[in-house]
Regions:
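Charge-rich amphipathic alpha-helical interaction elements
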Residues: 1-148
Length: 148
């Protein structure tokens, strides 16, 4: 009668850890996908906004040409143009922040893959031991049968 492998519980724990690590990779990859989509969206938004801003500045200057404005209104006009430039900086900062998020997510994916590799190695060690143990047990049983 075969006895049960004494490290079965440890093997179960190792297999569970390996599966958990694999799920961690899936979660990290999903986060990375989402971060990349967000980055592309931000970039497209920035480019569209820049195009609109250029057209808006041109439209504002065209409306200004040939008119007499008091200094106060000219100052307000210049402040409006400056606000557009500030808005561009804020949108560019959002793109940079999204790019940083992508880099962070890429690092998390790498770390998660490293955890899977480590967990797989640990599981493989126990599986190799179990295979050797099974062979030894089989040989002992064959010897016991041969003696009887």
């Amino acid at each position: 009668m075969s006895e049960s492998y004494p490290l079965d519980n440890l093997l179960s724990v190792r297999l569970f850890r390996e599966e958990t690590a694999k799920r961690g990779v899936s979660v990290a990859q999903a986060s990375l996908r989402e971060a990349r989509e967000n980055l592309e969206s931000r970039k497209a938004e920035l480019e569209a906004w820049r195009k609109w801003r250029d057209e808006e500045v041109e439209r504002r200057y065209d409306a200004l040409i040939g008119t007499k404005l008091p200094i106060g209104k000219l100052t307000a006009f210049n402040q409006g143009i400056a606000r557009l430039a500030d808005d561009e900086l804020a949108r560019a900062a959002a793109v940079d922040k999204s790019a940083e998020t992508v880099r962070t997510c890429e690092k998390k994916v790498e770390d998660a893959k490293a955890l899977v590799h480590t967990a797989r190695q640990n599981t493989a060690k126990i599986e190799a031991h179990k295979a050797l143990w099974s062979e030894d047990l089989k040989k002992e049983e064959e010897r016991a049968e041969a003696v009887s």
